[in-house]
Amino acid sequence: MSAGMPINPKPFLNGLTGKPVLVKLKWGQEYKGFLVSVDGYMNMQLANTEEVIEGSVTGNLGEVLIRCNNVLYIKGMEDDDEEGEMRD
């Protein structure tokens, strides 16, 4: 197994701002949406958020604020993976 280079999380998250992301919480929930902003504590604001359970979308939540200590991971999604565009 090869070790990857460590990534500073703040520039990584700032680079994802305005892009579609998938956020998985420690408790198993997954949310897809557009990352609107990240604060100094790494709390995240998502727009056009959808809840994903077992790979399928179960509901549209709209705008969501996720507290930093609940996040297991966040990953950027390809434009092909996310339908629609960011709306205000």
Swiss-Prot record:
The keyword tRNA processing does not apply. GO terms for molecular function: RNA binding. Residues 8-80 form the Sm domain. One of its GO terms (biological process) is mRNA splicing, via spliceosome. GO terms for cellular component: catalytic step 2 spliceosome; cytosol; pICln-Sm protein complex; precatalytic spliceosome; small nuclear ribonucleoprotein complex; spliceosomal complex; U1 snRNP. Gene3D superfamilies: 2.30.30.100. Keywords: Cytoplasm, mRNA processing, mRNA splicing, Nucleus, Ribonucleoprotein, RNA-binding, Spliceosome. CDD domains: Sm_F. This is Small nuclear ribonucleoprotein F. It comes from Drosophila melanogaster.
